[in-house]
Amino acid sequence: MKGSHINHGGVAGNTPIGGEHNHDTIGMLTLDAQGRLAASCTTSGMSYKMHGRVGDSPIIGAGIFVDGEVGAAVCTGVGEIAMRTVASFLVVEKMRGGATAQQACEEAIARMIKITGDPKQVQVGLLALSPGGKVGAFAIQSGFTYALGNSSGNKMHEALHAI
């Protein structure tokens, strides 16, 4: 979202040097040879954030969630929306209800769009993995990329998006 004026929830009136809100989250999902799912999540945080703000990344259910029998999900973007919808948990629960990893991500993003008011002002991306190795990825806007790695190698992908 380089050069955009998307509201990332920072303190009003503060503009980073260069005019960009440089921050992002790295979410990792893995499925081992025994079929066990795991996830991890780290974030650089948001520039000019409100003092004491806790983002979604460390909150189980918002930024990261795993149920070994159902699936795993991670979320990046505007943490307030991820927390409000319990995004990663929502994705895994959609999978529990029969949705594919992709369908679950799309349904969770649809719910986020419904509550945001103006989805053009926010970005959230979701990544999900099923115990069978099926991947889902979806975002509100373009620009959400993810990497897949397996014994055949690594490849970058751009997630589908709603707007």
PLM-predicted stretches and their roles:
Residues 1-163:
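N-terminal nucleophile
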